[in-house]
Amino acid sequence: MTILERLKIPAIVISSVLIIIACQSANTNRILEKNSPYNYQDTLLNLDIAISEHNYRIIHKSEIGSAIRERGDKSFPLSTVISFCNITYAKEMMLINEQLINDMPCIITVRESNNGVIIGTRLMDENVSDKHEARFAARINDDLKKIMEATIL
């Protein structure tokens, strides 16, 4: 076996690994969380006000923690998922890219944890090829961050 034949398999393996690594998308963490200085109920009230002040309307609240408590786990930490919408922005989003409805960004969570009360959201992906979509995502992300900041001030 010649040196070239011996190096052929390792070269193919190394090349394949490098190609796989290069083709993977960047792992961006779009989850944003902040600690609230308020108790759970006050944080929820502050969030309701902040959402309204930023021209969004609450469309649904999923009180996950309360539901689990009602099923018998009385000490389960409280947690709520709040969905909200600005219909004008929703229309704009659908006109830019109708598939974005699958990534509806306007959700903020409030939960009790060992570290206190945590609020969180998932930001839209701004690293996209469509410049209109990227600008829209940046604007919505800015709103989400402002709503979260107003909640915990």
Regions picked out by a protein language model, each given a short descriptive name:
Residues 43, 47, 64, 136, ...:
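Stable alpha-helical elements in mature extracytoplasmic
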Residues 2-10:
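Bacterial N-terminal signal peptides that target proteins for export
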Residues 23-59:
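Terminal, regulation- and interaction-focused segments at domain boundaries
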Residues 53, 59-106, 124:
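Compact, glycine-rich, soluble single-domain proteins
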Residues 11-19:
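Bacterial N-terminal signal peptides
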Residues 124-153:
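C-terminal partner/receptor-binding element of secreted or periplasmic proteins
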Residues 104-130:
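Beta-strand/loop substructures that line and gate deep hydrophobic ligand-binding cavities in soluble
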